[in-house]
Amino acid sequence: MQNIYLCLTAFARGTYPDDAAIAGAFDELMSGDAPDAAIGGFLVGLAALGERPSDIAAGARALRSRMTRIEAPVGAIDTCGTGGDGKGAWNISTTAAIIAAGAGATVAKHGNRAASSKSGSSDVLAQLGVKLDCPPAAVERSLAEARVGFLFAPAHHAAVRHVGPARQALKVRTVFNLLGPLSNPAGVKRQLLGVYDRRWLVPIAEALRDLGCEHALVICGQDGMDELTTTTGSDIAELRDGDIREYSFHPEEAGLALVREADLQGGTPADNAAAIRALLDGQQGAFRDIAILNAGAALVLAGLATTIPEGTSLAAAAIDDGRAKAALMRMVAISNGEA
């Protein structure tokens, strides 16, 4: 555990360790040999100084090196965000993934159980009939045939269990709250990535650049939502071909009316699954609007739209002509082993 202790010594002095020590420490954390006290000390020490983009990228590399990988078509995207915004909203990024798949994108949707809401992506997809523990070959088939597959984080990231007890004991956010979206098992290079605090917009974009991402929209609603919101504007850090630019986007640019936060409140996994079914059957309202907005951004990343407003229109059409619902139904069938 040499690198962890080198890092702890540096943290105690109020200084950053060198990059090699940080990278080595992350490897040691996920090896299963580090004591919980050392893991906790490393995570708190890094958080106290502030996680830099290079630190975040190092953690993601360590996680990626141990994950169970799947193959995805070239150009596949992910809509997984950090979660943890405390808003308790509908499962927006999951719904956006389904809609984007219906519109022609290939979406390797990485996700987990609920972080701060009542319903995480895996919770609602299970309610919709998706089998979470299907083998990698079934996920790959789903990506090929349904254009959407669910990559259940615990099934692909077994090494994370080694830091679980220390994280639970700390009860504070650490770098691991940021690493999941950076560690897609399909190795996607295009991402719509919502963060729970706008201070992470540029650092996450820089970490993605370090990790070889081609095109990403790192987003945070000005209401604190880790999505493109429809209650107000959203802030975006866009990474494209190595360059990062910051700008804001307002839902009215896509022809969408502003709503109240209360209009976006989700419920239990069963509640949210029922809402997704209704949306895919054509129900209008605030949930549809925020879902097509985020799906529209995903379609920009997939190269199927040039602007978010254009993508939003394409997303709406995929609902209205039944393609989005068909994508979900095919994903459910494949995950359950049906021909």
Curated annotation (Swiss-Prot):
EC number: 2.4.2.18
Subunit structure: Homodimer.
Lineage: Bacteria, Pseudomonadati, Pseudomonadota, Alphaproteobacteria, Maricaulales
Annotated GO biological process: L-tryptophan biosynthetic process
Residues binding anthranilate 1: G81, N112
Gene assigned in the entry: trpD
Keyword check for Transferase: yes
Name of the protein this chain belongs to: Anthranilate phosphoribosyltransferase
Binding of 5-phospho-alpha-D-ribose 1-diphosphate, residues: 81, 84-85, 91-94, 109-117, 121
Record-linked Gene3D superfamilies: Nucleoside phosphorylase/phosphoribosyltransferase catalytic domain, Transferase, Pyrimidine Nucleoside Phosphorylase, Chain C
